[in-house]
From Swiss-Prot:
One term of GO molecular function: identical protein binding
Protein's name according to its UniProt entry: Trefoil factor 3
Function: Involved in the maintenance and repair of the intestinal mucosa. Promotes the mobility of epithelial cells in healing processes (motogen).
InterPro entries: P_trefoil_chordata (IPR017994), P_trefoil_CS (IPR017957), P_trefoil_dom (IPR000519), P_trefoil_dom_sf (IPR044913)
Disulfide bonds: 33-59, 43-58, 53-70
Domain P-type: 31-74
Keyword Zinc: no
Protein backbone atom coordinates (compact mmCIF):
# COMPACT_ATOMS: atom_id res chain seq x y z
CA UNK A 1 0.00 0.00 0.00
CA UNK A 2 2.82 2.44 0.78
CA UNK A 3 4.50 1.78 -2.57
CA UNK A 4 1.28 2.62 -4.40
CA UNK A 5 0.95 5.91 -2.50
CA UNK A 6 4.57 6.75 -3.28
CA UNK A 7 4.09 6.19 -7.02
CA UNK A 8 0.86 8.18 -7.09
CA UNK A 9 2.72 11.04 -5.44
CA UNK A 10 5.56 10.78 -7.98
CA UNK A 11 3.11 10.84 -10.90
CA UNK A 12 1.27 13.84 -9.43
CA UNK A 13 4.50 15.81 -8.96
CA UNK A 14 5.66 15.02 -12.49
CA UNK A 15 2.31 16.02 -13.94
CA UNK A 16 2.35 19.35 -12.11
CA UNK A 17 5.94 20.04 -13.12
CA UNK A 18 5.37 19.32 -16.79
CA UNK A 19 2.19 21.37 -17.02
CA UNK A 20 3.85 24.48 -15.60
CA UNK A 21 6.88 24.28 -17.85
CA UNK A 22 5.00 23.91 -21.14
CA UNK A 23 2.59 26.84 -20.89
CA UNK A 24 4.04 30.16 -21.98
CA UNK A 25 0.80 32.04 -21.37
CA UNK A 26 -0.34 30.79 -17.99
CA UNK A 27 -3.62 32.52 -17.16
CA UNK A 28 -3.59 34.43 -20.45
CA UNK A 29 -5.21 33.67 -23.78
CA UNK A 30 -3.12 33.24 -26.92
CA UNK A 31 -4.87 36.35 -28.31
CA UNK A 32 -3.64 38.46 -25.41
CA UNK A 33 -0.05 37.41 -26.17
CA UNK A 34 -0.32 37.97 -29.94
CA UNK A 35 1.56 41.26 -29.66
CA UNK A 36 3.54 42.30 -32.76
CA UNK A 37 7.27 42.36 -32.00
CA UNK A 38 7.53 46.12 -32.61
CA UNK A 39 4.72 46.80 -30.10
CA UNK A 40 6.01 44.68 -27.20
CA UNK A 41 6.34 46.50 -23.87
CA UNK A 42 9.05 44.95 -21.70
CA UNK A 43 7.75 43.26 -18.57
CA UNK A 44 10.84 41.41 -17.40
CA UNK A 45 14.55 41.70 -16.97
CA UNK A 46 17.60 40.04 -18.55
CA UNK A 47 17.59 36.25 -18.17
CA UNK A 48 14.00 36.11 -16.88
CA UNK A 49 12.58 32.59 -17.12
CA UNK A 50 9.20 31.80 -18.67
CA UNK A 51 7.88 30.88 -15.23
CA UNK A 52 9.07 34.14 -13.64
CA UNK A 53 7.58 36.09 -16.53
CA UNK A 54 4.22 34.32 -16.26
CA UNK A 55 4.20 34.90 -12.50
CA UNK A 56 4.29 38.63 -13.27
CA UNK A 57 1.17 38.22 -15.45
CA UNK A 58 3.17 38.68 -18.64
CA UNK A 59 3.68 36.78 -21.90
CA UNK A 60 6.91 34.99 -22.79
CA UNK A 61 8.08 34.33 -26.34
CA UNK A 62 11.79 33.92 -27.07
CA UNK A 63 11.39 33.11 -30.77
CA UNK A 64 12.28 36.63 -31.99
CA UNK A 65 15.72 38.00 -31.13
CA UNK A 66 16.23 41.70 -30.45
CA UNK A 67 12.81 42.34 -28.88
CA UNK A 68 11.53 41.82 -25.33
CA UNK A 69 10.86 38.14 -24.62
CA UNK A 70 8.82 38.91 -21.51
CA UNK A 71 6.20 41.48 -22.45
CA UNK A 72 2.88 42.91 -21.33
CA UNK A 73 -0.21 41.22 -22.77
CA UNK A 74 -2.87 42.95 -24.81
CA UNK A 75 -5.93 43.91 -22.83
CA UNK A 76 -8.97 42.02 -24.04
CA UNK A 77 -11.67 44.50 -24.92
CA UNK A 78 -15.11 43.87 -23.53
CA UNK A 79 -17.94 44.05 -25.98
CA UNK A 80 -20.54 46.61 -24.92
CA UNK A 81 -23.81 47.24 -26.69
Amino acid sequence: MEARTFWLLVVAVLALGSSSSTGQYVGLSANQCAVPAKDRVDCGYPEVTPEQCNNRGCCFDSSIHGVPWCFKPLQEAECTF
